Design a protein with these regions (language model features):
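A mobile "lid/hinge" subdomain adjacent to the ATP/sugar-phosphate binding pocket shared
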Residues: 233-266
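Short, well-ordered amphipathic alpha-helical segments that serve as non-catalytic structural scaffolds
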Residues: 54-71, 282-287
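Short beta-strand-loop/turn "lid" adjacent to the catalytic site in phosphate-handling enzymes
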Residues: 69-105, 123-124
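Flexible beta->alpha loop and helix N-cap segments adjacent to enzyme active/binding sites
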Residues: 2-3, 9-13, 17-53, 98-113, ...
Length: 570
């Protein structure tokens, strides 16, 4: 059976916050996934193809991308799996039949299946994990509206959902959790917006199309700058300030606990720190309570946008509550269509087969396609027949503090660049963080850069000993190694790290091994291959355009190396 999961707006402009009737229309992270006879073919986010950050519109380009990858036509699709969303306009079109009519007109032979928002999140984690049996927890801002069938008078949404699965026995039990207010995701998001405005001393509408999906990550990075405060018991559940109280719920904090008396904080840095620490404490308390009540097993999958918070993930990882934890590389809404497609295949009793590296689900472009694009742009390039020699050259240039645009293998699926569509640099000199930021990324100064480390050298550089193959954990840098990787060490001595092996990512692992041979350091600075506010590059054409527009020194794409004709240095 050919199954297509798709997510996005339908007959409305989903990139606008409101329509002419002031209905909320904002949708983000549209895309599509194709599974054929249980085999994963392709997953892609719409933004990577349209070049519109967080694009939420109907994923036409994503559908075509997936069908092309599977060499299929619209008539070949047997089942469409559509995650629902927390928008009244979506439900209006659902009940009017608009969504079904649009899909059946495109896919004449397909059945349509609608899947709960949180169920789609859960499935994205369950069917990408290594264990066959366990439980799951979904936490985000808001999932599906539930008033239509469970509650008659009041609108409720999924916020905290749990469940149990056994793949061998084809068991998947889902229990949507309903809270009226203060779900982890929306509370953190709302306060992050207000703290960010205070930090930059500028009022920005919470639905501003440039910023609206980015507050959380910015404030998580800022929180380290307030870590000089000792987080004592009296700061747990404290009110940050009257100006920062969540508008709709002025007197409660995470999970509805009452505020303690108001405290005075000097600046936005301290407020960001207190918000983050309260998030971590509330998350750990909540998960501990569920575990103690036997709602969660020893093997756990986490999904939902709240699990992009790497600091919170790290607290759970170190808690000792579970024998194994799985967070997929796409825990946020990016993974919804993937999860919905997987759930459709599961219900069809198909065994789901994913690539060995579950983060690399996009297209792998051929050397011929790459060379053709280089010729289309009239670029001078050098081709390496031996990939190790290419990595040796690249490692030598990294050791000279050059900025490398790195384009290899299948593209990443999810919000992180994981060594396939990355910008790389030497992690040692502290100034390299500022050089990368001023020349290329143009981000807020307080946001750190991540690193990639060879897995077998993880314990040489970091205190914690757990792997982080999808950059979903933050680890503590050992004191004696801080200066060696200063450009990726945050002000609180942590690093958002990715661990790699040659088995899962041979290209970037080979490069880092060669870099270790010339520098002595088995780590590189890694950030996404894009400018601030742009999607990560997807195609060779995207990479070449970014190379031409950004102040980077080399483009290493497939077996080809392109050098900037004029290189500027700070």
């Amino acid at each position: 059976m050919n199954i297509l999961g798709l997510y996005g707006g339908f007959d409305w402009d989903a990139n606008k916050s409101f329509n002419e009737h002031q209905d909320l229309t904002w949708t983000h992270d549209a895309g599509a996934t194709l599974i054929s006879n249980g085999n994963h073919i392709s997953s892609i986010s719409q933004e990577r193809l349209t070049r519109i950050k967080y694009d939420g519109n109907f994923p036409q380009e994503s559908i075509d991308y997936c069908l092309s990858a599977g060499n299929l036509s619209y008539e070949d699709i047997d089942l469409i799996c559509v995650p629902s969303m927390c928008l009244t306009i979506w439900y209006k079109q659902y009940y009017e039949g608009t969504i079904t009519k649009k899909l059946t007109s495109l896919f004449p032979n397909a059945k349509i299946k609608f899947v709960s928002h949180h169920l789609s999140h859960a499935a994205s984690a369950v069917f990408s994990c290594d264990f066959n049996e366990g439980s799951f927890l979904v936490l985000d801002g808001a999932g599906s509206l539930l008033y239509s069938y469970e509650f008659k008078d009041t609108q409720h949404v999924e916020t905290n959902s749990i469940g149990y699965f056994n793949k061998k026995k084809s068991i998947f039990r889902f229990f949507p959790g309903i809270h009226n207010v203060n779900e982890f995701g929306s509370y953190y998001h709302s306060l992050s917006h207000k703290i960010y405005c205070e930090k930059i001393q500028k009022q920005i509408n919470g639905y501003d199309e440039k910023y609206r999906e980015s507050w959380d990550g910015k404030i998580m990075g800022l929180s380290a700058y307030g870590s000089h405060i000792e987080f004592t018991e009296d700061l747990k559940d404290c009110q940050l300030s009257k100006e920062l109280v969540y508008d709709e719920v002025p007197y409660v904090t995470f999970e509805g606990r009452p505020y303690k008396e108001n405290h005075t904080f000097k600046n936005a840095d301290e407020k960001a720190y207190i918000l983050q620490k309260n998030f971590e404490c509330a998350l750990l308390d909540y998960v501990t309570e569920l575990k103690n009540k036997s709602y969660l097993d020893d093997y756990i999958c986490f999904a939902g946008g709240s699990f992009l918070n790497v600091l919170g993930n790290s607290v759970l990882k170190q808690s000792g509550l579970f024998k194994d934890i799985h967070v997929p590389p796409y825990p946020n809404d990016v993974g919804l269509h993937f999860g919905a497609a997987c759930f459709g295949a599961f219900q069809n009793k198909e065994e789901i087969n994913l690539p060995k590296n579950i983060a690399l689900l996009g297209k792998n472009y051929t050397q011929e396609e790459i060379e053709q694009e280089l010729q289309n742009f009239n670029l001078d390039y050098q081709k390496y027949e031996n990939f190790e020699e290419l990595c040796e050259f690249t490692a030598q240039e990294l050791n000279k503090n050059k900025i490398i645009g790195w384009f290899q293998n299948r593209s990443e699926f999810g919000p992180r660049a994981l060594g396939s569509r990355s910008l790389l640099m030497h992690p040692g000199p502290a100034k390299n963080k500022d050089i990368m930021n001023s020349r290329v990324k143009h981000r807020e100064y307080w946001r750190p850069f991540a690193g990639i480390v060879l897995e077998n050298h993880l314990n040489d550089y970091f205190v914690e000993d757990f792997c982080s193959p999808y950059m979903l954990y933050s680890l503590t840098v050992k004191k004696e190694k801080k200066n060696e990787i200063a450009a990726i060490t945050h002000v609180d001595n942590t690093c958002r790290i990715q661990t790699v092996t040659k088995e899962l990512q041979p290209e970037v692992a080979t490069l880092i091994q060669k870099f270790k041979e010339v520098s002595g350091i088995p780590v590189v600075l890694n950030t996404s291959f894009n400018d601030n506010g742009e999607p990560i590059v997807e195609t060779p054409e995207d990479a070449i355009k970014a190379f031409n527009n950004l102040d980077i020194d080399y483009l290493v794409i497939g077996n080809y190396v392109v050098k900037k004709s004029e290189i500027s240095y700070l």
